Amino acid sequence: MPTNSYRFLVASEDIYFQNTLQQSITFSDPESIKVLKDFYHSNSRPTLTNKDFLIVYRKEKEKDTKKKNSSVIKFPRNDFNSFEDSKNDIQNQAKILNGKVGDFENSLLPRIYDLDELSKYASLARIQSYRAKTSPDKSEWQTVILDFIVTEKVQLVELINDPQNPKVGQIIIKPVRETIKSPEIHINLINDLLEMARKAKNFRIPTELLLIVDKFGANSEYSTNEYIKGVTNTLSCSPSLTYPQKYQLFSYNSYPAKIKKLYEHIHTFAEQIKLEDEINVILKTNLDKQQTEFILKEKIKAIRKKLGEDSRYEDEIEELLHSELGKKVFPKEVAKTIMRETNKLKSMIVTSPESNITKSYLDLLVALPWKKVKKDILDIKNVREKLEEAHYGLDEIKKRIIEYLAALIHRRSQSEGKPELEKVGSDYIDSNLFLSHKIRKVRSNSIPILTLVGPPGTGKTSIAMAVAEAIGKEFVKISLGGIRDEAEIRGHRRTYVGALPGKIIQALKKVGVSNPLILLDEIDKMGADFKGDPSAAMLEVLDPEQNRFFQDHYLELEYDLSQVLFVATANEIYDIPEPLLDRVEIIELSSYTFIEKIQIAKSHLIPAVLKENALDPKYFPIQDQTIDFLIRHYTREAGVRGLKRVIDKIVRKIIVKLLEKTLDQNFVIDIEFVRELLGIEKYDPDNVDSSPQIGTVTGLGYSPLGGSTLQIEVSTIPGRGDIKLTGSLKDVMQESARIALSYVQSKAKDFGINFDFENTLIHIHVPEGAIPKDGPSAGITFATAIISALSQKPVSHNIAMTGEITLRGKVLAIGGLKEKTMGAYKNGIKIIFIPKANEKNLVDIPQEVKDVIQFIPVDTYQQIYDFIFK
């Protein structure tokens, strides 16, 4: 065996590469003990002292957890003083002193096949002493501790087998010369390196370094070169450095290169400390700020407690927010806003104005229903029964509403993927509300808005209430009449003093659910001024594609109105803004007939009034004839509000007579009794003549109060050939009269009229001059009255007519035929001329009216002339 070959130890990063101070390794596994014994007996005098061995280092490879324990010797990751403390920990002890050649089954020893597995440089070590702990019978070693020093850095040359034991390998080495002298290195540089290492608090300095520094200071024989080597090599073995960093420093053969690289490593640690210090300063600043805020908040709490106030309000809100119901009801964005405002309120002085504003805002956020809904009653039979019970007549209207609700019920029951309402306690939660991805569902689930158009008192509001009751919805009414400020709908911004949310949000807060029926009353009576146009704000509310994201200025959060059933009412369809009209579905309600009013009075009004006044029905014996008298002579309306007031007045007067005991025991409410209680009749039938008159013809009119008759009078006076119009006629009606006169003049010969138009003034008057009148539908009535006056032929008082006339005598369609017909019916008209184009509207006329009145559809005026004057 060559003299420069050595047994070797495969080391890990815990071996000090060039540390000249004494180190220790503990062995306790049987195989390592066996190898040590062979090493012990390798000379004539058995010993381990002063024997040399190599410490070799494996090359860095990818980690293989399966071979980790068999390929790398494990040492404690700390300095040499800790080896003795860890000798009882098998995993932290050295496994083998000799490397073995070959591959042996069940071997825990490192397997070294050639030098390519090892790093180029190794450490030559000498055993200084050893301590062996033997078995009780002194025959076997159990634990061996080797004390050694690294004597030299060497280069590996060849791996060879031991002839005596082929299983054991040895390595041939050669010395390595390391240069140290350089003008770049002097004692001050080493001292600076030591100072930087001390300041880098995260860089661990081996304790051996103190011995080297002390030795150099106390022993003048300890040369500068030895000092430089000792400091450099000891710092290079710092536990703070990684194994690759340690070996890289070990591999340099020039101490200037080692010191330069070591300086870079320590400088990196110093920069890390600097960065950590900066971060700590920032953290301390933030912590100081938080502590200051905490102290101030605690002081505020103490002050509030001293003033008799506490934080129960904020605690109650937080408790609600974290409750099971709160987690389900409040959307995430709303919950964040509530928490933010609650924290803001905690830091405020209670008496400050801002505190009151924030508290009012929090009250609204907590009071709104958000995802809370009321479960609908999806029963079409129940809807029909409720409407029949609540209203008499209005069959067509009931059909429209039932069809509408049936479609709604069917759509909801057949909707795919919609989960059932979640019940939390006694409340229902709709998880489909306030979803971010619901835009794509809008068109398939959009519901048109119902708008009931009709005269006052015809039951628009009561129908809406009946619908809400029928499908189990909460009902709330919003009166829009006279609203001129857009903020009434969208709310005021919180920056304004006395700011409030809009009527929509207030209504939802009032009912406490997000799926009520909201009645928008008098939608046709909204106005606009310099404060904005509220009808424009209503566009967002009534548009199913927008109301899912309705924003109130006060709330400043989106509110989902998609589950609200809106029902609007109006008296006149022409007064509804066109953009709004485009978003709603119109259902028209017309005047009640006399028979309907009588039945309504008997079935609804009289029982309701008697109940309100706690009067026994036996004290209100009334017949249909008397009710009809009340309707005709004490009311003039399309609905029944006035009739209810008249009945209520009669009931009160009967109660007075009961208390005064002046009421006959067998009295009956007849026409004379009514006159006694109410006085003379307030209304007579419209001024319809009782006999045919020359120059007077009955026309038909329509107003928000319903239909009525109007007399058109024509007389001739000597004068210039001209026309005079009186009776508060507006432009369209004046033009209609002039067109009728021009038509009659052009057809005078055909009508047998021989009249001096150039020297005669024709005066046309429509009575009740205080009432403005407009519209083209009196055209044929003007023509008939003019012909009657010029030809001196009377027209029957039982005939009425409505229709626009052209210069060629064509009769054009008109609107409001049903209401006009009801006005004629109330005044005893028997024959009505209507435009042929309106014949299709006769289906809307009640049968009881058609049984009394004859309708004659005409295309041209000639047909009317032939019927009346020939």
Swiss-Prot record:
<comment type="function">
    <text>ATP-dependent serine protease that mediates the selective degradation of mutant and abnormal proteins as well as certain short-lived regulatory proteins. Required for cellular homeostasis and for survival from DNA damage and developmental changes induced by stress. Degrades polypeptides processively to yield small peptide fragments that are 5 to 10 amino acids long. Binds to DNA in a double-stranded, site-specific manner.</text>
</comment>
<dbReference type="GO" id="GO:0005524">
    <property type="term" value="F:ATP binding"/>
</dbReference>
<dbReference type="GO" id="GO:0004252">
    <property type="term" value="F:serine-type endopeptidase activity"/>
</dbReference>
<dbReference type="InterPro" id="IPR027065">
    <property type="entry name" value="Lon_Prtase"/>
</dbReference>
<feature type="binding site">
    <location>
        <begin position="454"/>
        <end position="461"/>
    </location>
    <ligand>
        <name>ATP</name>
    </ligand>
</feature>
<feature type="domain" description="Lon proteolytic">
    <location>
        <begin position="691"/>
        <end position="870"/>
    </location>
</feature>
<comment type="subunit">
    <text>Homohexamer. Organized in a ring with a central cavity.</text>
</comment>
<keyword id="KW-0720">Serine protease</keyword>
<keyword id="KW-0963">Cytoplasm</keyword>
<dbReference type="GO" id="GO:0004176">
    <property type="term" value="F:ATP-dependent peptidase activity"/>
</dbReference>
<dbReference type="GO" id="GO:0016887">
    <property type="term" value="F:ATP hydrolysis activity"/>
</dbReference>
<feature type="domain" description="Lon N-terminal">
    <location>
        <begin position="1"/>
        <end position="270"/>
    </location>
</feature>
<dbReference type="GO" id="GO:0005737">
    <property type="term" value="C:cytoplasm"/>
</dbReference>
<dbReference type="InterPro" id="IPR004815">
    <property type="entry name" value="Lon_bac/euk-typ"/>
</dbReference>
<dbReference type="Pfam" id="PF00004">
    <property type="entry name" value="AAA"/>
</dbReference>
<dbReference type="InterPro" id="IPR027417">
    <property type="entry name" value="P-loop_NTPase"/>
</dbReference>
<keyword id="KW-0346">Stress response</keyword>
<keyword id="KW-0067">ATP-binding</keyword>
<dbReference type="GO" id="GO:0034605">
    <property type="term" value="P:cellular response to heat"/>
</dbReference>
<keyword id="KW-0645">Protease</keyword>
<comment type="similarity">
    <text>Belongs to the peptidase S16 family.</text>
</comment>
<feature type="active site">
    <location>
        <position position="820"/>
    </location>
</feature>
<feature type="active site">
    <location>
        <position position="777"/>
    </location>
</feature>
<protein>
    <recommendedName>
        <fullName>Lon protease</fullName>
        <ecNumber>3.4.21.53</ecNumber>
    </recommendedName>
</protein>
<dbReference type="Pfam" id="PF05362">
    <property type="entry name" value="Lon_C"/>
</dbReference>
<keyword id="KW-0378">Hydrolase</keyword>
<dbReference type="InterPro" id="IPR014721">
    <property type="entry name" value="Ribsml_uS5_D2-typ_fold_subgr"/>
</dbReference>
<dbReference type="Pfam" id="PF22667">
    <property type="entry name" value="Lon_lid"/>
</dbReference>
<dbReference type="InterPro" id="IPR027543">
    <property type="entry name" value="Lon_bac"/>
</dbReference>
<dbReference type="InterPro" id="IPR003959">
    <property type="entry name" value="ATPase_AAA_core"/>
</dbReference>
<keyword id="KW-0547">Nucleotide-binding</keyword>
<dbReference type="GO" id="GO:0043565">
    <property type="term" value="F:sequence-specific DNA binding"/>
</dbReference>
<dbReference type="InterPro" id="IPR008269">
    <property type="entry name" value="Lon_proteolytic"/>
</dbReference>
<dbReference type="InterPro" id="IPR003111">
    <property type="entry name" value="Lon_prtase_N"/>
</dbReference>
<dbReference type="GO" id="GO:0006515">
    <property type="term" value="P:protein quality control for misfolded or incompletely synthesized proteins"/>
</dbReference>
<dbReference type="InterPro" id="IPR054594">
    <property type="entry name" value="Lon_lid"/>
</dbReference>
<dbReference type="InterPro" id="IPR020568">
    <property type="entry name" value="Ribosomal_Su5_D2-typ_SF"/>
</dbReference>
<dbReference type="InterPro" id="IPR003593">
    <property type="entry name" value="AAA+_ATPase"/>
</dbReference>
